[in-house]
Amino acid sequence: MNRIDEEPQIHEDPVENREEDDEDEDDQYEFDDGFLVNGSDDGEEEEEQRHCSEKKSRSRRKKDESFTLHEDDYLLLKDNNDTFQRNKYKRLKKSSEEEDKINNDDDDDDLSHFIVDEDDHGAQGMRRKKMKYKQGTDSNALRYANDVFGDPEELLKLRKKDLKYNEKIERKLEDEFEPMVLSEKYMTEKDDEIRKLDVPERMQIFEEAIGIVSLDDMSIQEESNWIYARLLQEQGQGCLINKDDIVKFLEMFHVQKLEIPFIAMYRKEQCRSLLDSSDDDHDGSDFNLDKKLETKWHKVLWMIQDLDRKWVLLRKRKTALFGYYTKRFEEETCMSDLNKSLFESVIKSLQAAETEREVDDVDSKFNLHFPHCEIDEGQYKRPNRKSQYSICSKFGIKEFANKFGYSAEQLGLALSLEKVFVDELEDAKKTPEEMALNYECAMFGDSQAVLKGARHMAAVEISCEPSIRKYVRGIFMENAVVSTSPTPDGNVVIDSFHRFSAVKWLSEKPLRKFDGVQWLLIQKAEEEKLLQVTFKLPENQMNRIISECSEHYLSVGVSKYAQLWNEQRKLILEDAVHGFVLPSMEKEARSLLTSRAKTQLLSEYGQVLWNKVSSGPYRRNNNTSEEEAAPRVLACCWGPGNPETTFVMLDSSGELVDVLYSGSIGLRSRDVNDQKRKKMDQDRFLKFIRDHQPDVLALAAVNLSCVRLKDEIYEAIFQMVEELPLNYVDDRIYDFPLVYADESLPRLYENSRISSEQLPQQAGIVKRAVSLGRYLQNPLAMISTLCGPGRDILSWKLHSFQDFLDPDEKYEMVEQVMVDITNQVGIDINLAASHEWLFSPLQFVSGLGPRKAASLQKSLVRAGSIFVRKELINHGIGKKVFVNAAGFLRIRRSGLACSSSQFIDLLDDTRIHPESYGLAQELAKDVYAHDTVRGDEDDAIEMAIEHVRDEPASLRKIVLDEYLRSKNQENKKETYSLIMRELSCGFQDWRSLFKEVDSDEEFYMISGETKETIGEGRIVQATVKKVTSGKAKCVLDCGLPGILLKEDYSDDGRDIVDLSNKLCEGDIVTCKVKSILKQRYHVLLVCKESEMRKHRNLGDVDDYYHEEKRNSVLIEKEKVPKEKKQFKSRMIVHPRFQNITAEQATVYLSDKNIGESIVRPSSRGLNHLTLMIKISDNVYANKEIIEGEKENKDIVSLQRIGKTLKIGNETFEDLDEVMDRYVDPLVTHLMTMLNHRKFRTGTKSEIDDLLRVEKGVNPKMVVYSFGVSHEHPGSFILSYIRSANPHHEYIGLYPKGFKFRKRMFGDLDKLAAYFKRHIDNQ
């Protein structure tokens, strides 16, 4: 290893300090592995040969072109003659490709004559052969075409006519579009089948993924038992669940093909215990018509569906394995009683397996005892690495292994208490060594080898026994603990603000205590080699396992033979438990922790989405009337100037009405011209408001400019109110609402494909503003818009750790949430038919999906409006789909239906399902008959329904329980509850009321930060804008203003009279957040050295996080003698900078990729930094960075980075520019060198030895190669041998290229070409 001292010498490149010539060289590069040094006479002769070669090549190409058939000609021949074949097509194509290579060779540069390993005669012969072959093929093809079809030109004319005619014929979609396009648009044949089949679309996808589901009573009962047991394990969620309700759910789902939203809405009576009834009408209290229902996420039903999928897949796998095992066993050549017994035990274990892991255990046991048969001789066989077990079995050791006593199966039965053996184990009358002598062979030459092999076989069999694994698994998962500690890299990287800081020092945390995403963080940190993770089973539990196994496996005999055999058995148990079972349990524990963490993270992710999508639209003055139209929204998105701040006006249907660009409305300049532009924009804005009369203004909160913009808007409105007469101003202007809105979703919409389809040719900021306004009007529809084939919704940042989830996992949760909420809200079909964007939630309606919804949408748009729910069957959906969807599709007089006088049934404007219309009509008639004397008229039903709709108070007179008893419908309380609510107010919005953002949300939206990034104690950088004697006004990188008081500047702040003597405008200060004034959008800062060094834990500290462990490690480090030179810590915040020594930097880069770099402090003082780059394994280059324009007021100023950075003659403004302009191009050239064909790894002497060998093979050639210079890291060595002795020259590595002999080369091949021509001009 190339030793790096604490402060290595900054090596100057050996080729530095030489002037660069301006002489230009030809653009040449080499293709040979060696070259000859030729005289000048040879050049003229070879030049003449090259011109001759080019002339012949052009002649050949000219001939070839005249005999080449176009691809269309071959297609024409094939179309008109079924027997026609393009003979030797592949050879013809190959010939063409090789000819191209020859032509390229003809065009090579001057270096082509250095190639000495090509057989010229062979090459010419090959070219002649190709010419003859190509000519014969082409002429035959043309002659055949002429004889059969005539002149090719006439054929081409006919072909063009045919093409024009075929364009008129309708082609298949598969021929017109790429498969990806057809898949995205759901236009494949499979999509057509899904659309046509009268089964809910999501159910079809579900069943396609899991296969055929057994629907007999026994299978459903067996599955319900399994699901119930799983639910009981989920933190007691199954305690209140009735198992019969699970059976009914499975029957409704699989047999009746009813989706979850339908079951939750219309089959409550059949699965009460599966529904959260805490706030429902059937919670045991009296029915209250005035109580507003709330949307509910039916998690238990979705959980049962997920368990249903797992059960079907588990059963499918068990069935497949049963058939496979049976077939394999029947093929066994030796069907002994032992094998039959083993097979029967495997089948019994397979039938009893209840989880995938238990099935894995059974599969391991079967494959151990019934390995794959050897393939017959002569057949191809993939080489397999034979296991030690199979080798022992092959040499007959298995027979001896069976003599240790109880088998693995017997031990497992005893541990599981399934069968207790009363007979004592009989010990052999020989020692193990004596008995092992009978099994010696060539592979196992002595008794100890035989014993070792036999013990291994017994241990493996024990480790593969399902009952034993289940026993150990139960103990391990309940008692195992996890500890974490940082690696050397992690100790440097993970500070108190790092995302892994909370899991840096965990000590013996039990598996069952892991919660949230903690394990995912540990797993990620381990992948990044920042943490070491250890699993451990406590000593007492380990002893328990060994003790219980020994109790059933060891002999109770006291003889010498019994003791000797027991010693062997103890070794077997130790090997089985420690060598096989526990390591596999650790893998299972990791998998289990990952699964649990992802499940919880998915739930949290879904909950955030649920909170957003279940939020109601903005209502004027919180008016909850369902009849009131959506508000007219004026949406505003701030623009920096290009684009300008933009206002868009949306009508109550969310359609774009008008756009106003106003780039000067928020100006705060006192310039006269700026003020004029501002006044003009204010007048235009006020006219915009007067013309369109919006109900609310939604302002996207993205930065502090939006706060000023809000003030300017209010100022303009107040000025208008003051100037205009009272009778001229609309009442709403006095209390004009302006709300902040989150711009994250509108930005996704702006860049999505659907926005271009819905708002073609509109500017991006207009699309964004439209989305902002629509989100206020209908959050559900706006979010659904991004749930199309592109799945743009997955880019919405809902959870800080959502990156740990796969896209498919996230979208499955998105679909679950969207399906549940959409069906509780419903869709106004007629309104959506007139406004396309409102159709976006249709795909989530029960029974539908993206394919069926798209088909239904097209049909409804063509129809314009629909007046009866039953008409939906005429729009391409079958009866089963109609049953699922009908109750959630709202039919009312909206959209184009407003202008129609056609009758619309009021029940179609409710959540009442058509199957319950009879009950609803009967209830309405009873109420109507009670309130009036007219009840026998023909139109009594319509009048009764209108009566209860107009006078919902009449329904309150009914005592529901008594009414149900009178109708003998006590088991339909939930159905009647829904009927009464919907008759009172159809499709009442159950979503939560719209809430404006609170002060915390407003602050984080405006700042663009989060609680994690701008919390108290966070290290930040601030730029000084203004300094007074007592304080400095700064600006953080996020744009927030900061205040640094004099007393917070340094520890001796009280002695500072005037802060302006310490700071200047433009200074960059590294400081810590002291506190946040969220109401004023200000941050108080501190940069005292004592405060900067304080360690602060953020958030809740884990109970198993032990700082003492961390401190003990630090104390141990302090005990180590400080042999290295110290450096001054620097107050620099940059991803590539670390306060570490050169040795620590070497350790940090040791396992990184070549080209990785780090910036660290320099021992040369506070005006220098060191850039360390990994050149090769164990070779690191150090580049000196000189800092300029630094203030020398105090130590804090010196610890900050300079305003200019200089490396060599290049000057940079900051470390980012150093990385972009210096490191990145330098690493690019480094990789070019390392990947060059002439590059060799090794030291200079090792490369010289390689060249000597190459020279011996080709004594007439000048052999050369490139290598890394270990003496001058950052440089390379050009080594070459002309006659006998190696010669060396250095090559410098720079961002601009490679420096060789005072010349800079941007291309390594050009450098090699220059070296060849000027090998004598050193």
From Swiss-Prot:
Alphabetical list of Gene3D superfamilies matching this protein: Nucleic acid-binding proteins, RuvA domain 2-like, SH2 domain, Spt6, Death-like domain, Spt6, helix-hairpin-helix domain, Tex N-terminal region-like, YqgF/RNase H-like domain
CC annotations in GO: cytosol; transcription elongation factor complex
Domain of life, per lineage: Eukaryota
Stated role: Transcription elongation factor that enhances the transcription elongation by RNA polymerase II (RNAPII).
Entries under PANTHER family matching the protein: TRANSCRIPTION ELONGATION FACTOR SPT6 (PTHR10145:SF6)
Record protein name field: Transcription elongation factor SPT6-like
Extent of Acidic residues compositional bias: 18-33, 97-110
Subcellular location: Nucleus
GO biological process: embryo development ending in seed dormancy; nucleosome organization; transcription elongation by RNA polymerase II; transcription elongation-coupled chromatin remodeling
The UniProt record lists the keyword Ion transport: no
Any single Pfam family the record assigns to this protein: HHH_9
Family as reported in the entry's similarity comment: Belongs to the SPT6 family.
Positions of the UniProt region annotated as Disordered: 1-65, 90-113
Signal peptide annotation: none
